[in-house]
């Protein structure tokens, strides 16, 4: 077992697959007690059991819709009762409802904003008091290259992901004096279920804009998250780490 997060208590939202699963796995490999939050109970419990078996760390699952403030607050209290502290939070949960703005429904707009951006408020506002009390904590918010440069058909997603960056920079200034660090990761074109559904033509068009000429992996995002969650980045806060093969 590696040792960057030994005995740290970590929450990873949207951790049952893709980037979130990669982050939860690497954290567990580095000794963290990890709780995966998600809305698919079967997938979440399976992922948690798989990681527990493979890493030897304590990995659990909690059924939490991060767009629901009361649900988030209740689970934070349960987490504190079990672990006594919250050392690391990774806000990774997110959805897409792509459409050109002229065709985008209010529901498509609101659902993405509520889940991708509203959840950041819900989770951070619930964990920040115990972190302040402990005078310690690391928050890693997963944004996107789309939040930095935009993408047609994704005004809702781009607005949410750009909002995450602004939120994180502001919060980092509020809580830095309490030894709490808040940073963002902006992934580029990453090999996940979301990108697997794209046509070959669209994938090839995306790859033309990637100087490194390939798709990234969830493990590469996880390495960035591990860095920002651990003391390896103890003097870094309010920053956006682009992991995008040079796209930005």
Swiss-Prot record:
GO terms for molecular function: 3-oxoacyl-[acyl-carrier-protein] reductase (NADPH) activity; NAD binding. Gene3D superfamilies: NAD(P)-binding Rossmann-like Domain (3.40.50.720). It catalyses: a (3R)-hydroxyacyl-[ACP] + NADP(+) = a 3-oxoacyl-[ACP] + NADPH + H(+). Substrate binds at residue 144. SMART domains: PKS_KR (SM00822). The active site is at residue 157. Pathway: Lipid metabolism; fatty acid biosynthesis. Its EC number is 1.1.1.100. One of its GO terms (biological process) is fatty acid biosynthetic process. InterPro entries: 3oxo_ACP_reduc, NAD(P)-bd_dom_sf, Sc_DH/Rdtase_CS, SDR, SDR_fam. NADP(+) binds at residues 14-17, 65-66, 92, 157-161, 190. Keywords: Fatty acid biosynthesis, Fatty acid metabolism, Lipid biosynthesis, Lipid metabolism, NADP, Oxidoreductase. Transmembrane segments: none annotated. PANTHER family: 3-OXOACYL-(ACYL-CARRIER-PROTEIN) REDUCTASE (PTHR42879), 3-OXOACYL-[ACYL-CARRIER-PROTEIN] REDUCTASE FABG (PTHR42879:SF2). Homotetramer. Belongs to the short-chain dehydrogenases/reductases (SDR) family. Catalyzes the NADPH-dependent reduction of beta-ketoacyl-ACP substrates to beta-hydroxyacyl-ACP products, the first reductive step in the elongation cycle of fatty acid biosynthesis. This is 3-oxoacyl-[acyl-carrier-protein] reductase FabG. It comes from Chlamydia muridarum (strain MoPn / Nigg). The gene is fabG.
């Amino acid at each position: 077992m590696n040792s960057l997060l030994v005995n740290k208590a970590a929450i990873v939202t949207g951790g049952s697959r893709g980037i979130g699963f990669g982050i939860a796995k690497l954290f567990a490999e580095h000794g963290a007690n990890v709780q995966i939050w998600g809305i698919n109970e079967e997938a979440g419990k399976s992922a948690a059991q798989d990681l527990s078996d493979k890493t030897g760390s304590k990995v659990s699952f909690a059924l939490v819709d991060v767009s629901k403030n009361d649900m988030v607050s209740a689970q934070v209290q349960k987490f504190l009762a079990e672990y006594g502290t919250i050392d690391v939070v990774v806000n990774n949960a997110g959805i897409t409802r792509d459409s050109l703005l002229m065709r985008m429904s209010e529901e498509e707009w609101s659902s993405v904003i509520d889940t991708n951006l509203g959840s950041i408020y819900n989770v951070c506002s619930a964990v920040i008091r115990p972190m302040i009390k402990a005078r310690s904590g690391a928050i890693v918010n997963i944004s996107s290259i789309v939040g930095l440069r935009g993408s047609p058909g994704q005004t809702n997603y781009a607005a949410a992901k750009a909002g995450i960056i602004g939120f994180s920079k502001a919060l980092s200034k509020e809580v830095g004096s309490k030894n709490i660090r808040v940073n963002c990761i902006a992934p580029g074109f990453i090999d996940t279920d979301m990108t697997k559904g794209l046509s070959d033509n669209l994938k090839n068009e995306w790859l033309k804009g990637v100087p490194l000429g390939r798709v990234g992996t969830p493990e590469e995002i996880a390495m960035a998250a591990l860095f920002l969650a651990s003391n390896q980045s103890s003097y870094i806060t309010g920053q956006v780490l682009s992991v995008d093969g040079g796209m930005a």
